[in-house]
Every structure is written in structure tokens, then in C-alpha cells.
Amino acid sequence: MGAGGAATAIQVQAALEGAKKIYIFNCKDKFYANAENTARKIENKVPGVTVEVYPLEDSQKLYEKIKESDILVNATKSGMKPAEDESLIKDVSVFQPDFVVADAVYNPRETKLIREAKAAGCKIALGGIGMLLWQGEAAFRIFTGESMPTEEVYERFFRG
């Protein structure tokens, strides 16, 4: 879910890692055209991948496609402080035990989406702290030319 920078990176990486189908859901806003462009680019550059774009407002289609999927990623601001009680998934019955749910949101550490995925028994439900940490590592390397002490940074700032 989403079509901004983080979402686009996740969608492209999913295609490069072997995803056969990618469903992009985004609000009919200024980023919707980005989603359509991303879909075309992925299909043109990565053989064997089908990318479909739908309006996030179509919850029936969203739930239908979630049921066909193995992974759900939220790369929108939904659930981010100060709206931590928000989730784009209203019907949590779509979460199954073998399902993977990830959220790019890192504040709060555990979004409503992740809490509900865990409560539903999803195999993996993880928040955005890892993404934040590794983006920081990449930026550190770009600006300093050195590797960031990632484990130390994680222990000091993100553990617990």
C-alpha cells in the first residue's frame, strides 16, 4: 500500500527478488500516477512480473487481493503518530497464519496494523525500525565513506 518513495523502492525490490505479481494500492491522489508509472517500469524491466494498480479506496478489491497474496506492506503514513490508532485494514479476518505483514512506519514502533497482524497469528509482522536503521547506515556511508556501527546504533537507540 502506497506509491511514494519508500513504496516504490519496496515494489521494485520485490520484483527483483522474484515476485510474480505485485498489487499496488494507493489513494487517488498526486501519487496515483506514480503508482501507474512504477507498474509500467517494473513490467518493462523485470521479465515475468505482473503489476496491477488499484485505488486504495476500493476496500473490496484490496481484501480480494490480500487473500491472493503472501505479503502485505504498508508504505503509507497510516498508523504513524499522531494517528497511531489508524489502520488501512479494517477487516483483519484477511490475515492468515502463513501471511507476512510489514509496515514502513517506525513511530510508533508497533502500529495498529502490526498489532492486529500479530494478534491474528501472522507468521511475520514487523515494523519499520529496520528500514530506518538501514537507511541511516546507507546515509552514514555516503556522507562519511565509512560503515556505520549498525549493531551498536541498534543497541543504543532502537533496542527495547
Predicted regions: what is each one?
Residues 49-125:
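Rossmann-like adenosine-cofactor binding region
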